[in-house]
């Protein structure tokens, strides 16, 4: 009844809070979600809760990256897996207003230039709000030579899927099979892995 639905809302709120603050997931909370998901199969809570749980379980070293489709700067839809399949890749989730994100990305430019012809790819995905004006300025100023995609107004909930909450961004190094090798690796770590592969 309505109490179950209210309880479901509270379970989802708690999952989201833990994701936002990058807290641990406990079995009891996950069990409560699964019981309620069976009861409310077609609920938006069920879909959102699954997205949150997938992030908890997958987005870590040894897990698999979460695929998505978002537009590039010209508005063409691009599926991430189409770009990085069979390559060692960095998925750079960033924002024009996140200066630490931009500094990390700029530090990757020499590595990208050195290894881009050897099966290495970087894909930037910028979390922007309202428009892409500041994003275009940042790309021009910082000189990123790789593909940039746009997550506008959290339309695809990529930050939620990647367990980033309200953070400006995150960097994910994945292998040729889509397995996450490192989260927020330093440029030296990326280069070391590329030299070994």
Predicted regions mapped to residue ranges:
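Generic structural signal for well-ordered beta-strand positions
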Residues: 78-79, 181
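Oxidative protein folding and maturation machinery
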Residues: 1-78
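Short, small/polar residue-rich loop motifs at catalytic or cofactor-binding pockets
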Residues: 64, 87, 166-168
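Short active-site neighborhood of thiol/selenol oxidoreductases, capturing the structured segment around
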Residues: 79-102, 108
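Conserved beta-strand scaffold positions in the cores of enzyme catalytic domains, especially
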Residues: 122, 148-149
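Hydrophobic beta-strand anchors of alpha/beta hydrolase catalytic cores
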Residues: 90-91, 122, 171
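Thiol/disulfide oxidoreductase modules built on the thioredoxin-like
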Residues: 142-144, 151-196
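Structural microenvironment flanking redox-active thiols in thiol-disulfide oxidoreductases
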Residues: 103-142, 154-160
């Amino acid at each position: 009844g309505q109490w179950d639905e209210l309880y479901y809302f509270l379970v989802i709120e708690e999952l989201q809070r833990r994701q936002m603050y990058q807290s641990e997931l406990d079995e009891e909370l996950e069990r409560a979600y699964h019981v309620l998901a069976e009861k409310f199969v077609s609920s938006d809570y069920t879909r959102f809760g699954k997205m949150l749980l997938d992030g908890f379980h997958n987005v870590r070293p040894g897990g698999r990256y979460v695929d998505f489709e978002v537009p590039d700067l010209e508005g063409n839809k691009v599926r991430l897996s189409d770009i990085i399949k069979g390559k060692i890749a960095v998925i750079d989730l960033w924002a024009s207003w996140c200066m630490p994100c931009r500094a990390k990305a700029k530090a990757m430019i020499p590595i990208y230039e050195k290894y881009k012809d050897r099966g290495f790819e970087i894909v930037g995905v910028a979390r922007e709000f309202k428009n892409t004006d500041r994003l275009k300025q940042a790309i021009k100023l910082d000189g990123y030579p790789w593909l940039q995609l746009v997550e506008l107004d959290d339309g695809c909930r990529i930050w939620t899927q990647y367990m980033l909450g309200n953070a400006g961004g995150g960097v994910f190094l994945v292998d040729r099979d889509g397995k996450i090798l490192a989260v927020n690796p330093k440029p030296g770590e990326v280069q070391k892995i590329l030299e070994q592969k």
